[in-house]
Amino acid sequence: MAQGAMRFCSEGDCAISPPRCPRRWLPEGPVPQSPPASMYGSTGSLIRRVVGPGPRGRDLGRVTAPCTPLRAPPSPHIAPSPWGPSSPTGQPPPGAQSSVVIFRFVEKASVRPLNGLPASGGLSRSWDLGGISAPRPTPALGPGCNRKLRLEASTSDPLPAGGGSVLPGSRDPSRGPLVPPQIGADGLYSSLPNGLGGTPEHLAMHFRGPADTGFLNQGDTWSSPREVSSHAQRIARAKWEFFYGSLDAPSSGAKPPEQVLPSRGVGSKQGSGVAVGRAAKYSETDLDKVPLRCYRETDIDEVLAEREEADSAIESQPSSEGPHGTAQPPASRPSPCPGPSSSLGSGNEDDEAGGEEDVDDEVFEASEGARPGDHMPHSGLLKSPVPFLLGTSPSADGPDSFSCVFEAILESHRAKGTSYSSLASLEALASPGPTQSPFFTFEMPPQPPAPRPDPPAPAPLAPLEPDSGTSSAADGPWTQRREVEESDAGATLAPRKELPSPSHSEDSFGLGAAPLGSEPPLSQLVSDSDSELDSTERLALGSTDTLSNGQKADLEAAQRLAKRLYRLDGFRKADVARHLGKNNDFSKLVAGEYLKFFVFTGMTLDQALRVFLKELALMGETQERERVLAHFSQRYFQCNPEALSSEDGAHTLTCALMLLNTDLHGHNIGKRMTCGDFIGNLEGLNDGGDFPRELLKALYSSIKNEKLQWAIDEEELRRSLSELADPNPKVIKRVSGGSGSSSSPFLDLTPEPGAAVYKHGALVRKVHADPDCRKTPRGKRGWKSFHGILKGMILYLQKEEYQPGKALSEAELKNAISIHHALATRASDYSKRPHVFYLRTADWRVFLFQAPSLEQMQSWITRINVVAAMFSAPPFPAAVSSQKKFSRPLLPSAATRLSQEEQVRTHEAKLKAMASELREHRAAHLGKKARGKEADEQRQKEAYLEFEKSRYGTYAALLRVKMKAASEELDTIEAALAQAGSTEDGCPPPHSSPSLRPKPTSQPRAQRPGSETRAGAGSTRPKP
């Protein structure tokens, strides 16, 4: 809602609307022009002169001034009249917007013009219409009429009240003849573009210098005596020439007019003691930047009486032809300011010359004795770029005559793209009392803009600077705010600099000056709902990676997201822990809502932890996993408040179980944590006390007997299974696996869907030792029948018989064994079952396999060793450490990139290195008796070196046989190996191939379970 303010002198009365004017009294003129899209703001002022009633019984003196539009070229299109059938009264014009209207009540005073021009009549209609009239008598003012008027500063009005009272002439209402002004050396001006005639050009720069700023320092109030002093005339002349240029053209050769000192009346006041009616601040650099403005006055009563002449004035605007009987001024007179046209008849020169400044203000003055015989001269016509279309809001009884006339004047004499409300509300306005405020505030509803074609932009002569000369002290806060707004919107309005707005009436009220046709910034086009939908809402709608720290918590969104995470609706198990482990309020809410789906009532801590870990894959960094466990501990304590003393105690015990699980079932070779160690580590951590020993013993036994299993991502598992069945996959995934293993992350299986199948057949498996040769629990040592498939470097164990192309199940995939750097040997020391062979993997797990026959056993041993020798990549160098503790190096599971010959040479080099290191190790400890942990480490290293020597010897011998056979068929290699045992040269088969010729030992010796003796000497293993 735009707002307007009305200010008037507390000593004078305000304008009361006259009797209502019938609609038929309004002038019926031609169809006005349509306002351009960029003209929308204006300021209207009302001026009242204390005079008697008019000849028609109407109260005179209700006038309007000034009205300032935005500068824009006239629209070439014609729009229907607002009173026509196409635009009913009360409807806003297309593209119109609400603006601020300032109604100013100023008691007019007669100001004598310069050079003896008649001024007793004040501002006359002859000046308004471009003609000159004779002076007329003015009734004497009463004692209360000679008042000081306090004017409201408006940036749209460059001259204060009375500033435009330097007049060329006046007209007596009782006489018709017009008295022309004195033109030449004694004339103040001849023809101004707004009906005032042009100004001589030799005074155009008279008051442009910095030295003339003294005229600008004026007071806030001024008196209006009957006889104007010379000081007042000089001030008026200075203001006029400052805003509109000098009044004499240098080409005319005339001298500047001399001021006529009027005789002072008895009641006149000294001019030196009079303050001028508005405070204006100028700087020396702003004098040349003040845009020129022209005034125009029209009497409301005369417009009512002479509506035909007013209509003819509008008709003459686009055609540059005035009505018959109008006075034509000299055509050679130049215009002091870039007005609508230098000839005052055409509206196109403004566009052609690129003048950015339109006629900003008009002053409409009431005069007595209006006669219909007076005509508006061609030179005095106001060039209105576009007509003003009214969007009135009539009262219940309809608009009164004053409102109608005011609207008619604004429509017919000014070009506005602004919609005004009806002035019928002024009827209730009365003279302010001593205690009443001199301001009246009202609101006008904004009018919705309609799409309009953009008018052609004029070519500006120079960039228009803000009118600093028209800013008063009262406008300071508004002007400062406007400057801030313009600085913020500078980037947006930069492309439309061809349509600058010199109107400051909107600026003083903080209204934007953006053209109607301009598009809003891109930031305003973004929907607020999109900006309010933060990342948490978008995550709840399906996104999985939009959470970040500091997001605002939303309980409803957290509940929706937790429900979807629990049901895995659009999420995977691997995504759950990531969303629960974030360190922000929203993730905490999500975790709390997610844990509400779990009911741990009556469960022990380890049981609840197993149930919880089956639903999500606990992944991420340590702090993220710790946050997830904290949410679990909180929920467990809520369900079992009697089981533990506090929530912190539950969290401490949960983390202790996770560490115990890693220590007992991890890949470390050191000493395992005992039950006593576990209890001792938790002393004093239960809120300063100890946990019950029975509880800790039960938890230790549970974790030791059955490790905590993390959930496996089903999506990744299904993708891996499909890749095993797909012969031509595009993506190869790594799947943790290993029968009876701990799903070590260091020993991932790399399925090779395109790998060849080297052998398949029935096998019976038994897990003999877990990684690092740890003894397998008795409950997991049983024999199980499978159908083995050697595909690539992976031995798959299926429940059913092998069918090419059939996908493996989850359990079958978990039973898969990687054979990289593995060695298969005949189990000659195992006598419980026939045709049994050992398979030791890279992580030192030991399996026993029983084949249906001896031939099948030898075939499985040969093919497993050949495939391992062909594709096992060279190992990385051993780790360097300052400790004497032995640690086996990790062996790569990827396939080698070496050629067959390079692979053979690598195996032979490693064989020599292992043999040399084994001799050094035995020599170093010869004759020394080690005890305890040191003796165990010596035995572990010696067993490792013996196994590696045997493995690399077997690999090198098998690859030599394969290269000699010059065939990729394993059947051919098996036949060649069988012949190598009875060759003519007497060369025995490789001693490192126990599957071909195992050699029994003569003296067995007790060994640690899972260890081996020296290569080639046989071994004695404890029977499981």
Swiss-Prot record:
GO biological process: neuron projection development; regulation of ARF protein signal transduction
Self-association and partners: Interacts with ACTN1. Interacts (ARF6-bound form) with KCNK1; does not interact with KCNK1 in the absence of ARF6.
Localization, UniProt: Cell membrane; Cell projection, Ruffle membrane; Cleavage furrow
Cellular component GO terms held in the UniProt record: cleavage furrow; dendritic spine; postsynaptic density; postsynaptic density, intracellular component; ruffle membrane
Family indicated by similarity: Belongs to the PSD family.
Composition bias, Basic and acidic residues: 495-507
Pro residues composition-biased segments: 71-95, 445-463
Protein's UniProt name: PH and SEC7 domain-containing protein 1
Phenotype when changing residue 621 to K: Significantly impaired guanine nucleotide exchange factor activity on ARF6 in PC12 cells
Residues carrying Phosphoserine: 126, 156, 720
Biased composition regions of type Acidic residues, renumbered to the chain: 348-365
Keywords per UniProt: Cell membrane, Cell projection, Coiled coil, Guanine-nucleotide releasing factor, Membrane, Phosphoprotein
Ranges for region Disordered: 67-96, 154-195, 250-277, 307-401, 434-536, 976-1024
Keyword Coiled coil among record annotations: yes
Species this protein is from: Mus musculus (Mouse)
Coiled coil stretches, renumbered: 898-924, 956-983
Cited InterPro entries: PH-like_dom_sf, PH_9, PH_dom-spectrin-type, PH_domain, Sec7_C_sf, Sec7_dom, Sec7_dom_sf
Domain PH: 756-869
GO molecular function per UniProt: guanyl-nucleotide exchange factor activity; phospholipid binding
Any Pfam family the entry gives: PH_9
Protein purpose: Guanine nucleotide exchange factor for ARF6. Isoform 2 and isoform 3 induce cytoskeletal remodeling, but lead to distinct morphological changes in HeLa cells: isoform 2 induces cell elongation and formation of actin-rich protrusions, whereas isoform 3 promotes the formation of membrane ruffles and loss of stress fibers.
